[in-house]
C-alpha cells in the first residue's frame, strides 16, 4: 500500500458518486502533484479555476447547498489560507446559522508542501491543521499520516451522514516516500 496509490484510489472512488464535482487550480491540467491523482477522473467532473481561492471556496459552499459534494482542491495550506473567510464564516457556520436547515457537506483537499529534495521555504511547507481545527466548529480536519489512513478518510468524508464538511490534509513528501 503506497500513499500516492491510495490517493489515486480515493479520487477514483469519489468520482464514482454522481454527487461529486472536483474544482480548483490544476485539476484538469497538469500543475501540481495532486493533479496526477485526478488523471482517471472523468473530465466532465473537473472544474478548472483560476487562482482565486476565496471565489473557489464560495463556489464550494454553493455547490454543497445544492446537494452536490464538491471536492475542492487547494494544493497547499498557503492557498487555503486565502479562502479562510469563506471557510470559517460561511461553509463552517451555515448549518449552525440555519439551525440545521441547510447542510453543506464538502470535501476540502489540501497539503503540506514537500520539503525534499529541496526546501522551498516556509511559505510552502506550513501545517495549519491545528489552527484550522480551533477556528472551525463543524468542519472536521483529518491529517493523513500513513497510507492506510488515506482511503478511509476520503470514504468517511463522502459517506458521512451528518452533513458536515471534511478537510483532508496530505503530506507532499509522502507521495513518493511512503
Predicted features and spans:
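Thiamine diphosphate
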Residues: 1-178
Amino acid at each position: 500500500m503506497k500513499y500516492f496509490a491510495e490517493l489515486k484510489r480515493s479520487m477514483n472512488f469519489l468520482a464514482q458518486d454522481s454527487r461529486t464535482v472536483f474544482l480548483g487550480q490544476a485539476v484538469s491540467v497538469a500543475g501540481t502533484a495532486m493533479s496526477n491523482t485526478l488523471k482517471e477522473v472523468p473530465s466532465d467532473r473537473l472544474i478548472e479555476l483560476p487562482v482565486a481561492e476565496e471565489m473557489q471556496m464560495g463556489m464550494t459552499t454553493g455547490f454543497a447547498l445544492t446537494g452536490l459534494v464538491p471536492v475542492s482542491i487547494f494544493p497547499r495550506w498557503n492557498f487555503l489560507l486565502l479562502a479562510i473567510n469563506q471557510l470559517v464564516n460561511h461553509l463552517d457556520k451555515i448549518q449552525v446559522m440555519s439551525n440545521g436547515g441547510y447542510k453543506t457537506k464538502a470535501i476540502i483537499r489540501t497539503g503540506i508542501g514537500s520539503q525534499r529534495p529541496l526546501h522551498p521555504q516556509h511559505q510552502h511547507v506550513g501545517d495549519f491543521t491545528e489552527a484550522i481545527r480551533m477556528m472551525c466548529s463543524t468542519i472536521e480536519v483529518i491529517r493523513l499520516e500513513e497510507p492506510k489512513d488515506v482511503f478511509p478518510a476520503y470514504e468517511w468524508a463522502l459517506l458521512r451522514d451528518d452533513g458536515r464538511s471534511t478537510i483532508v490534509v496530505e503530506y507532499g513528501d509522502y507521495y513518493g516516500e511512503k
